[in-house]
Amino acid sequence: MKTLLEMITIEMKEAFKAAGYDEELARVTLSNRPDLCEYQCNGAMAGAKKYKKAPIMIANEVVEELADSKYFASAEAVNPGFINLKLAPEVVAEYLNEMAADENLGVEKEKNPKKVIIDYGGPNVAKPLHVGHLRSAIIGESIKRIIRFKGNDVTGDIHLGDWGYQMGLIITELKKRKPELPYFDESFEGEYPEEAPFTISELEEIYPTASAYAKEHDDYREEALHATYLLQNGYKGYRAIWKHIMNVSVNDLKKNYERLSVDFDLWKGEADAQAYIPDMVEMLKEKGFAHYDEGALVVDVAEETDKKEIPPCMILKSDGAALYDTTDLATLVEREKLYDPDQVIYVVDKRQELHFVQVFRCAKKTGIVKPETELTFLGFGTMNGKDGKPFKTREGGVMRLENLIREIDDEMYKKIMDNRTVEEEDARRTAEEVGLAAIKYGDLSNQASKDYIFDVDRFTSFEGNTGPYILYTIVRIKSILKKYAENGGVLDGTIRPAENDAEKSLMLQVVKFNEVIDNVYKETAPHKLCAYIYDLANDFNKFYHETKILAEEDEEKKKGYLALLTLAKKVLETCIDLLGFTAPERM
């Protein structure tokens, strides 16, 4: 289904052509003066020089060609040459009824769907999730849903940090505490225990203890580095511990991400890429891409057009150890081999941009990925506290993600109980649903690349540009529709042409849905989806306050209102699903 903007652009092209002008001048945009008109066309201004004519003359001639157009209630040429367009209410109503009948609400799927991998989340195992993990998870999940909604084949990969020095630290600390475990007995020949020798709580305490101790004791650090080396070279006792660490950690991570409504298709990590490193290194050497520089193996990725220095991509350190560059390149080798993606999107902290510039250039230069494969860096800014510094606990430490979620849920629970519209048990469940919307909308309503301030008081408010306000609007619509059905009403009406400004504004906002989705998709910009649903919620609430919906005596008119509300609800629910949260039945 074409967007309404596309349809009226086609109509304008015909008018320009009929008036003797280039149809490419017929560029229609939303009006920047909605008090005067809904859409505008400035093509006459652009054509004045080419046709050596006053723009107002061109505009008048084009407007004459629109006299019989069914699309416009009025088309007016105004000085110095703008064309102001007001849509015919019948056309808007007809379009909305077509949207309502379409399972995709008028959104056209990709004609040539792409195979896309989104790399997001990226936590290290054996460490608790903290607020720094929030943005990658929330933004990545929303982008995954948006790209999938347009009909693409999308795979979300968490890409765990599961293979580095932290593993050696945990093994070394465990050996210090429990030397009697069979994993540390080189002569042990039996089966290793199926049950892990630690809980998630113990594991989360072991790592920081070991990390702090290693900074003060060189011998301990050396032992941890050696343990990392043994693990990476297949020592079976340490491989068995590593499997326990992975199982315990991943089970806990799954619970935490489930609470955030974040769902990964792949739970792969750095460890999965290790098998691809030797052949990749050999290929880079054989084909002359890699060379040694001060003992390290590197690939030059600088280009003549660079405005700043781009250092070489480091493949192996002088001691032969692999690095992040190596692992990320090997992961691309693996992805090419197993999934053959058209695009790989990395949703990571924007401070990692240089690293990904190096990796992307190296992957393209060396043929690790095909020339046409899109490698996209989507860098996000920092989530800050009210002081403008990275978000911390009151004591100044890094806040665990589960504690932040609990704090938001408690705040929502208090506000819901103050309203006393739901039972206590329902209030807890509702608080979790609304709390998640507060967190996700609070983040996603900001442009991903910008830093933003996480303000608990503002994000949990039922007023203003917040998640709770959006949900409150949806619940209000649900309540009206439910009340009508409970009184024996049947929702079988069709949307009628608007009769007042509030109704017209709401209809024109709903009409924009597919256009907004296309734009959000092209720009990978969830913040634009948030801006849209905030405007839509405002237009609905204005209509609600100015219109007697259920008290309307004309049954056909009432059914028309309810058909419009049903469509607005579907649009809002689709949008919040793309943002990664849901609305309760009551609030």
What spans do the regions from the language model cover?
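Non-catalytic interaction-recognition regions
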Residues: 1-93, 105, 110-587
